[in-house]
């Protein structure tokens, strides 16, 4: 069925929870899945060997889009990840009371697309605490779109 990588940056644990749910759904579909915290990865060659790459990142800041701090080094070096031609999906948690609700999701998707990734146009933007049912449903949609 293929191999997937799920990389997340999480401060409060919400994005990590969603990443774990997404990884489980992908595994249940028969994919081999690697789940990694953004603090534990380097961008260079990150996507090599994967059919699907899923990024999860929370958004901080009111006046401008701020990616979760652990994710910033990966984002800055994303050009070295080898995303060209790979299927990529993006999710994140945020607070809809902020001007740029889940802006990190859009920023990551746009950067991945500019690097030649085949971004699955189904971003998941979660307001506040994660809804695991919503995360499961999204992961299933990503699987269908990636097929």
UniProtKB/Swiss-Prot annotation:
Residues 4-143 form the Flavodoxin-like domain. Its cofactor is FMN. Signal peptide: none annotated. GO terms for molecular function: electron transfer activity; FMN binding. Keywords: Electron transport, Flavoprotein, FMN, Transport. PROSITE patterns: FLAVODOXIN, FLAVODOXIN_LIKE. InterPro entries: Flav_short, Flavdoxin-like, Flavodoxin, Flavodoxin/NO_synth, Flavodoxin_CS, Flavoprotein-like_sf. SUPFAM superfamilies: Flavoproteins. Coiled coil: none annotated. NCBIfam families: flav_short (TIGR01753). Low-potential electron donor to a number of redox enzymes. Belongs to the flavodoxin family. PANTHER family: FLAVODOXIN 1, FLAVODOXIN 2. This is Flavodoxin. It comes from Megalodesulfovibrio gigas.
